[in-house]
Each structure stands twice: as C-alpha cells, then as structure tokens.
Amino acid sequence: MAKYKIGFDMRKLYYLFILIVISCNVSLAQSRKSVSILGDSYSTFEGFMQPKTNSSWYSATPKPETDVTSVKQTWWNKFIEENGYQLCINNSFSGSTICNTGYDKADFSDRSFITRMTGLGFPDIILIFGGTNDSWADSPLGDFKYGGWTKDDLFKFRPAMAYMLDHVIHNYQNVEIYFILNTDLKKEINDSVKNICQHYGIACVELRDIDKKNGHPTVKGMSQINEQLKTFMTQNSETLDSNTIDSCW
C-alpha cells in the first residue's frame, strides 16, 4: 500500500512539474515582443506569409535571380531571431504598391498596402517596407492630403501613403511603427515618404547601399537591411515606446 502511495505521489509530482514547465514557456512566449510586417517582394518568403495566397518572390527553390534560398536568410527573420522577438504576421505581397495603382496603370486594390493594412494581427512592432513598386510602376504621385480621402485619392501614392499611416496609428495603438525606405527609388517617392512619415511622427529607416541582384536584396543585402534596422532602433531606443502586448492574437 505504501509503495502504491509513493508511486501515485511521484506521478502527481511529475505532472505538476510538466505543468510548471508549460506555464513557464507560455509566460516566456507572452513576454517576447511580436512583430508584424507589411511589405512587398523584399519581405516575402514562400510558406511564411498570411494570407497564404499572397504572391511570393523568395522561396526555398533555388533560382538564378537570387541567392536567397532559406527563410533564415531574410532580413525580417534575422531581425526577429537576433532580437528574441516572435513573428506575429507577415502580410507581404510580391509586386504590391502602397496605393491602388500598379504596373501598366492596373488596379492593384486587391493587393495594395492600403488593402492589406488591416490584416496585421495584434503585434508590438509593425515594420512597413514599401514604396518600391510605386516607384518602379510610376504610380501617380497625387497631392499631400491628410484627411477626407476619396476613392480616387487612394489610387495615388501620396494620399494613399498618408491614409495608410493614419490608419495604422489609430488602429494599432501602443505599437512601435517603423517605415523602411528602400534605396534607388525616385527622388519624388523618397521625399514624399520622409515628409509623410514626419507629419505622422513615424520613424523612417532610410536604407543605404544595399546589395541587390535583379533589383532584390541578396543574402548580403538581407543582412545589411537587418543590421541597419537594428542600428536605427538602438540609436533611437530612448524615444521608443516600451509597452508590450501579451500575444499576437
């Protein structure tokens, strides 16, 4: 009888230990900041975007256009892993523009940043990396406009950019928001991004000398983006909001 009781007590202790370990792991996960990404091809990797139907440029299948073949080589995965963060949602779509005007003046409202900006979950940090395709596609610039946007306005870069930042500020409160500005874009796009970010008080990370192949970051370029983003955040850490949210969803 005593032997049975000892065995029973040991099982109870074992299960208690397992519960403690699980609780500790859950608490650790909840204390880690979560990151959501709103981007274009630079931030894609097949199988890691939400929704899964989003078009991807990078994948594990080797192709001559790039040397990036692992998600671990992407700028955003490096950034998350090296900072001890967790991925909330990567809502990136290859070829997408911020505004609703895409290549050949096509209607890109099915994939634009302003369409996808509502699907970022509940992160602690939002990284917006866009404007590249607006520049490459010669999307119309439009005027600087900070309210009262019309449907027509959202087919133009400047009002759409303002509309997007206005939305994320008001719908993702207590969240750190960064806009990452690519290299080699048209001056009008660069100046517009910086002016609109300044208007809303959004941190603009202006990249420098990123290594690319076929217009897209190489493995080296991905590392450069990660390092420049980390450096920017470190240098501006005193001004950042340190509040965290327990989980992504």
Language-model regions, residue ranges each:
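Conserved SGNH/GDSL esterase-like catalytic core that processes O-acyl groups on lipids
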Residues: 34, 48-142
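N-terminal secretory targeting modules
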Residues: 1-71, 81-82, 119-121, 173, ...
